[in-house]
Regions:
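Nucleic-acid substrate recognition interfaces
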Residues: 1-192
Length: 192
């Protein structure tokens, strides 16, 4: 089971900058995917757009840590997969509402930043802190290195929400599963 530890942080220039660059990368990649779709009616998947960004030495892509840039491109990929799934449902008459291609983010806006486990400092986690790569922000946490999944920075109007996602084994689920395994044999006999 996944849980989230949330922290609210006041506005800072560092967080403003990384979320603004995230928005720029998202819009740049979205432009390339949309243009390709309009010209060929085919989809540029995550691997293709990632290769284009690397080969063109895109400034928006390289202005963020590589793993963060990849997560933003994966987010765009999920948005387009959802768009195409809706188109397929509409063709099968399972969806009757209008479908719109993913839109650009506001020019002056900010975008979510996802930092995977690999981009979080391991030495700080052992000390009970989350240190975001390329940022000087340290956040106290109870999450351990083995449980950590990712950290998300969500921009809001006058603050940021930092969500630390971690995995926990649900003891109740584990207990029920062990009961089911033991009772499976008895259930089969009762059904016969």
């Amino acid at each position: 089971m996944y849980l989230i530890e949330r922290h609210i942080i006041k506005n800072s220039k560092e967080l403003d900058g990384i979320c603004f660059r995230s928005k720029n990368l998202y819009n740049r990649a979205l432009y390339l995917v949309r243009q390709h779709y309009f010209e060929t009616k085919k989809y540029l998947n995550y691997y293709d757009i990632n290769r284009i960004m690397i080969d063109s030495k895109d400034t928006d892509y390289y202005s963020l840590p590589c793993k963060v840039s990849n997560e933003i491109l994966k987010l765009l990929d999920r948005n387009f997969k959802s768009f195409f799934a809706l188109i397929k449902k509409k063709k099968d008459n399972k969806y009757d509402k209008s479908i719109k291609i993913p839109k650009y983010l506001d020019k002056q806006g900010k975008n979510i930043v996802v930092l995977p486990k690999q981009s979080i400092s391991k030495t700080y986690i052992r000390k009970g802190l989350i240190k975001l790569s390329s940022l000087s922000i340290e956040i106290p946490t109870k999450v351990t290195e083995s449980n950590l999944v990712e950290v998300r920075i969500l921009p809001r109007n006058n603050h940021y929400i930092v969500e630390i996602t971690y995995k926990v084994e649900d003891k109740e689920v584990a207990r029920l599963q062990s009961l089911l395994k033991g009772n499976k044999k008895h259930l089969k006999e009762l059904i016969r």
